[in-house]
UniProtKB/Swiss-Prot annotation:
One of two assembly initiator proteins, it binds directly to the 5'-end of the 23S rRNA, where it nucleates assembly of the 50S subunit. One of the proteins that surrounds the polypeptide exit tunnel on the outside of the subunit. The keyword Ribosomal protein applies. This is Large ribosomal subunit protein uL24. PANTHER family: MITOCHONDRIAL RIBOSOMAL PROTEIN L24 (PTHR12903). Part of the 50S ribosomal subunit. GO terms for cellular component: ribonucleoprotein complex; ribosome. PROSITE patterns: RIBOSOMAL_L24. Coiled coil: none annotated.
Length: 106
């Protein structure tokens, strides 16, 4: 399995599918499934029974995972979707950078 280009906390843009063009912050990365949960995107409705946690019950909206092939990291310099590369910085540490601008992604 190859290394994933997306990490928790990244701002990503959807490049394909129903939410194409929308962006959000990554809440969780599901490595084995190669999917990510992005804040406010790919919303699904779940019917919940009343419980101690949710005494009212009803229909709840929540984020569903999106396959990482449909996501690109947003370039911090330009604000547009970009591919990610890896290179050694001046300290000899491997860092991610935006291919479009060359800006390091933290």
């Amino acid at each position: 399995m190859s290394k994933l280009h997306i990490k928790k906390g990244d701002t990503v843009m959807v490049i394909s599918g129903e939410d194409k063009g929308h962006s959000g912050r990554v809440l969780e990365v599901l490595v084995k499934e190669q999917r990510a949960i992005v804040e406010g995107l790919n919303m699904i409705k779940k019917h919940a029974k009343p419980s101690a946690k949710n005494p009212q019950g009803g229909i709840i909206s929540k984020e569903a995972p999106i396959h990482i092939s449909n996501l690109n990291v947003v370039d911090p310099k330009t604000g547009k979707a970009t591919r990610i590369g890896r290179r050694l910085n001046e300290n000899g540490k491997l860092v991610r950078y935006a291919k479009k601008s060359g800006e390091e992604i933290k």
